[in-house]
Amino acid sequence: MKTTPNGIDGMWTELVHMCNEQFESEPFKRLVNTKFTKARAQQYSIQMAFYVQNRRDCWGYVQGSAPLEIKKLIWQHEEDELIGRKSEGKQDHITLAVKEGEVFGLTAEAFERNPRLEGGEVCFSAWIRLAQRSWLEAIAASAILEMRNSGELIQGGSLSKRIGAMLERDLGIPMKKQINTAEHVVMDVEHAHLLMQVARKYADTETARNAILQGAAESLMVDRVYRGHLADMLETLPDN
């Protein structure tokens, strides 16, 4: 992949463009045009909890290979996800994902009882492999998913915001009761800028910028495949 000609700012512009292009892909269009039923919302909620777990795995690998100061930056990001913000009464995001399932009629046991999608498992493995690449590729592969979920960067709203609006429309569940979705609508705006913080110091060569673009592009490719598997799963369930 070739970098854009305008250095770091040009690279950032390209990354934002790539994130917006996700929503023009067939898998994303299928997913955001789904009609949610209770059964579909339940299965989607369960699979997204597995997705959150995979994000924690991947960021752990990224942190392990990154320079010390970037390890600290990643930990600041992951502290919200793994521990929450106790001072604000906010729980970790795995707990939030399970608790959000309650509004769809799920118990905590349902998250343990239901298996991961086979296609989802393959995508999770692919993301872990990306997280084990050179650290710039690896951090881009994980951070680009935060950018793709930032309402500040995505025209028409982030994926979390769109899904939340669909659930409110189809099931009458307000966003404030979708506690995990609502949290990501807010937090991923903040987290989306992590990659630019890294790039300002470390993406000072074309090789480094190309590594970031490559890691991001491959992660978004996996993301499209994963959303396609989610759309497939939802389509197998009754639409009424």
Label every PLM stretch briefly.
Residues 173-216:
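Accessory, usually C-terminal, subdomains that scaffold auxiliary metal cofactors
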Residues 2, 203-240:
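Acidic, carboxylate-rich catalytic segments that either coordinate divalent cations
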Residues 67, 71, 108, 203-210:
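Structural helix-adjacent loops and short alpha-helical linkers that scaffold large soluble proteins
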Residues 2-28:
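Acidic, low-complexity proline/glycine-rich segments
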Residues 16-23, 32, 36-65, 137-161, ...:
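Alpha-helical bundle segments that constitute or directly flank the non-heme di-iron/ferroxidase center
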Residues 28-33, 169-171, 203-204:
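Short, charged/polar, low-complexity loop and linker segments
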Residues 6-11, 72-180, 221, 225, ...:
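Active-site-proximal alpha-helical scaffolds that flank and shape metal-associated catalytic sites
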Residues 59-63, 98, 164-168, 196, ...:
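Amphipathic alpha-helical segments within well-ordered protein domains
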